Amino acid sequence: MSLYAPIAAIATAPGRGGIGVVRISGPDLAELAQRLFGRPLTPRHAHYLPFRAADGEVIDEGLAIYFRAPHSYTGEDVLELQGHGGPAVLRRILARCLQAGHDLGLRPAEPGEFTRRAFLNERLDLAQAEAVADLIDASSEAAARGAMASLSGEFSQRVNDLSDRIIHLRMLVEATLDFPEEEIDFLEKYQARPTLQALTHDLDTLIAQARQGVILREGLHVVLAGKPNVGKSSLLNALAGDDIAIVTPIAGTTRDKVVQEIHIDGVPLHIVDTAGLRDTDDAVESIGIERTWKEIERADLILHLQDVTQPPDHLDAQIVRRLPARTPVLNVFNKVDLLDAAFQGQPDSLAISARGGIGLDALRQRLLQLAGWNPGAESPWLARERHLHALQQAAQHLEIATEHAREDDRVLDLFAEELRLAHEALTGITGKFTSDDLLGEIFSSFCIGK
């Protein structure tokens, strides 16, 4: 597959719509435009034209816009045809383009190939390219703002600034190693220790902000677990603000998981209602209970719901023993509205009424706390787990470099190597040092046409 052949795809989402776009990118598309429209197109001007089949039949009418390289999304020539958003119409326009450009090497685009070309042509760095997909996938206003902040280069600029400072420090180390006859006390002359301290402080700040960005992008997988009829489905409905799950007084109503995404202060939470945990001879219910335990195993957070009107029994004890120790568990006591006296719960628990709305605001705030969300923090950009991992790797190498800095100039070669590794970790975020396998994995997750 040639990276330089022209490519074409429908750029708008599948389905019917008012407007649909066919996008083409590649070298020297002026010739293709001449073939399609019988006339040249002025760059960066919208031309209202008929889109014709090879036999002259008018397929549609719309706007044709030609962007001449390098002033385009991909950095190549780009031709966009904007017509009506019917799937059949767009397929015919795309087919006509591929037919007209066949001898020019025009082919259908792969998923994410337009953005990959933008990256390869240095129109975007890798973090910005990922932000394109995140902006498309954003499910809340906060996530969309965070993705736009990343796309504008805010995150990349912070990473590049740290990277440049590490390079400068490493350059001084290498110079000292290359000219040992000068007998320079590097660590003292160039204030390596305070420079490292400042670098470490700024990197730690960036890591904290990246954690917020990961939470905003990926959210939390929250599983509602407990015995039958403790109010799991009622709580799901209350948090969602809609009747998502069926609620009846019959034990075992929920047989399979019900997943609903909600947003609290812009943070996405994937709430999973599950089958009630109990001993049963019902084959179908048993399958649902096994699936419940699988969901519990993969949860980021478990809400263990209990009915305050019923005393704890052996089943509650069994559930507590089997809950995974590595996963945070919040004990939630439901149906407090049915009590005559005030409920005295456990220290680290919440008392609520899913149906009456009591305690739900406190529960929402506790969910954000357990997610690690800091509402008072600086408005974050979106980040991915790979970004956070790379930042943490860089921090580890700076920590080792700091240990060497406490010694003397005899370990400057080790000091320089740790700086090199820290720099390498940071450049992996923006794509200056990234394997082809990782690039393929990132861009394959994009939609076709982007």
UniProtKB/Swiss-Prot annotation:
Q: Name one Pfam family in it.
A: MnmE_helical
Question: Which domain of life does the protein's organism represent?
Answer: Bacteria
Q: Which UniProt keywords apply?
A: Cytoplasm, GTP-binding, Hydrolase, Magnesium, Metal-binding, Nucleotide-binding, Potassium, tRNA processing
Q: What is its EC number?
A: 3.6.-.-
Q: What does this protein do?
A: Exhibits a very high intrinsic GTPase hydrolysis rate. Involved in the addition of a carboxymethylaminomethyl (cmnm) group at the wobble position (U34) of certain tRNAs, forming tRNA-cmnm(5)s(2)U34.
Instruction: Report the subcellular localization.
Output: Cytoplasm
Per UniProt, GTP binds at 229-234, 248-254, 273-276, 353-355
Provide the TrmE-type G domain boundaries: 219-372
Q: What is this protein called?
A: tRNA modification GTPase MnmE
Give me the residues that bind Mg(2+), please.
233, 254
Q: How does it assemble?
A: Homodimer. Heterotetramer of two MnmE and two MnmG subunits.
Disulphide linkage map: none
Q: Which residues bind (6S)-5-formyl-5,6,7,8-tetrahydrofolate?
A: 23, 80, 123, 450
Query: Main localisation, per the record?
Result: cytoplasm
Q: What family is it from? A: Belongs to the TRAFAC class TrmE-Era-EngA-EngB-Septin-like GTPase superfamily. TrmE GTPase family.
Locate the residues binding K(+).
229, 248, 250, 253
Q: How is the cofactor bound?
A: Binds 1 potassium ion per subunit.
* GO-annotated molecular function: GTP binding; GTPase activity; metal ion binding
Q: Which GO terms describe its cellular component?
A: cytosol
Q: Which GO terms describe its biological process?
A: tRNA methylation; tRNA wobble uridine modification
Q: Which cofactor does it need?
A: K(+)
